């Protein structure tokens, strides 16, 4: 396989570094002594590390009255970001967002004109520019990749031509304006392809059509880059999912021969995309397998769980419990530091940098993710709800300040574990508790309880204490709410991240657990997926049941489309079932079977599925109990 050198990428970031240091009297190594947030310098971080931000919303925010401040002084948002050490910006382009109407459909209405405006302003500040082609009139991501309305009903050959022509046009326009992009990505979060349904990766024909479209986009960039300086990227989401990245890029590079790009881009949001250790493994594997540079092109961390408008936010307490960082300014700073450190530590210097996604998206009326709706992102921005720069922005310079000592952060507290149990039944105690450090990093650590299986004879509130090895002077506490309803299912919440208590038959490899917000109602859930047709049963059997009527229930979310999918209960009288019909990611539904009569003390409950290739989803909070 052809391997690219990093010459273009090094030129990209060195130019940004030099220009950024010269602007506005700022210095890359400026003192950060006043910073209130705590982060250590990153050992070995290169001087040319990309510290970027996607700021596509800025024109719309400004048009609607949004203002930005640093230490109480109103300033241009891009100026603040540049002064804080950000050396690159990313701008997304939707082909024709006005195809939805004269005012577009929200999300910044980010057409080429707005992208060019931001790029021009950023270049004037000495910053570099990454152009993100969505090849859609609105958001393109793993869950939706619809072609521009002008390209609807085009076949694969025509779509490849469309991609070439449109990409070439934008490149020519940027060149003519004197703001040639420094980096271009062909498509956005292409897990499942783009330009659906023709270039969707659910068939070999779809993969081929996708590869042809990507190849034409890459060619259009190259044909309009006479100095061969523009870096070319292909970008996926789910940065922790090594199997996804291997299968996608094997198909693109090995099977379809599309290798004329420099960078593999990753989206990594800790509350959706697993652990940083998984991200690191995946990035290093991409370096080994394909010889590409790697960039985390989207990431973000919450600074609060409060809301700045009426729209429910993408990240809240549930996501905080998964992310590994408190939703505080310090937690945001620590999360940003850690993702930069993991990218910086990629082998052979191939980890080139990160882009924070929309740090500018403060709550401004009318600037919602969709027309008529609010902002889901304001608590993930790096400005408060009034537009004041947060101290977490200082991290971009602090990570490179090698004059600062490395500090070992101590444990601040052990968060109480909240547990629900049933009268007269052993309580399922958590195997781990959340340990919070002084820098608002949260680690899940094993706990030893004084009573590992407490049983309580009456409903009420109880506590059990425990210890965490290596954490001196702090006591773990489980706050237990004991209720009358007795859920007989073992490990029905999957909160310990395993399938203990469940019998899986059939295609076992398709079933595991998942620990990401949206895929689980709590910290973890049962999960299923396979790239080929599969079937399985997940069951629990019971004996010694009291005579009476019982209820079985579960919650599910997923893409739907299975051949057969039921919640079932088997008794001596036969089987009862409820058909499960999922309607999308994080769209949870409860399925219930009531009045299950049991007289011989025996029952089996569970999930029965016959699925098609690519079917995916989660099962959580399974209950089986005697009705009162």
Residue ranges and their predicted role:
Residues 39-55, 483-507:
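Extracellular carbohydrate-recognition regions
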Residues 53, 120, 131, 494, ...:
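Extra-cytoplasmic beta-strand recognition segments
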Residues 80-231, 235-239:
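Substrate-binding cleft and catalytic face of glycoside hydrolase catalytic domains
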Residues 285, 304-338, 342, 346-350, ...:
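Aromatic-rich peripheral "rim/lid" segments of glycoside hydrolase catalytic domains that contact
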Residues 440-474, 478-479:
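Serine/threonine-rich, repeat-prone extracellular segments and beta-strand-based repeat modules
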